[in-house]
């Protein structure tokens, strides 16, 4: 088995105008591995949707998104990749 692997996550978010929303996305971690770091996040390249925070845990990532557009942003696809490392035994 490889020492390092990855898993992907995907969700759709809606954020009211001028609001911040934490979006928690769960991902699967194969047995014997643990989350190491976030490799990338893509928010459909929306220019008015900056990321305010990222918290990664055992099997989920919480991403804080701020809507600066002045209107509700709907159905923005949020995808990313988490790097996993094999646990030492």
Question: Residue ranges of each PLM-predicted region?
Answer:
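Short structured motifs
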Residues: 47-50, 67
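Extracellular receptor-binding modules and their adjoining Ser/Thr/Gly/Asp/Asn-rich linkers
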Residues: 1-33, 58, 62, 66-89
């Amino acid at each position: 088995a490889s020492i390092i692997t990855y898993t992907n996550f995907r969700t759709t978010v809606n954020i009211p105008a001028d609001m911040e929303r934490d979006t928690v996305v769960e991902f699967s971690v194969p047995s014997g591995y643990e989350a190491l770091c976030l490799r990338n996040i893509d928010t459909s390249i929306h220019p008015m949707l900056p990321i305010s925070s990222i918290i990664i845990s055992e099997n989920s990532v919480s991403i804080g998104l701020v809507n600066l557009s002045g209107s509700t942003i709907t159905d923005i696809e949020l995808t990313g990749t988490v790097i996993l490392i094999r646990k030492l035994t």
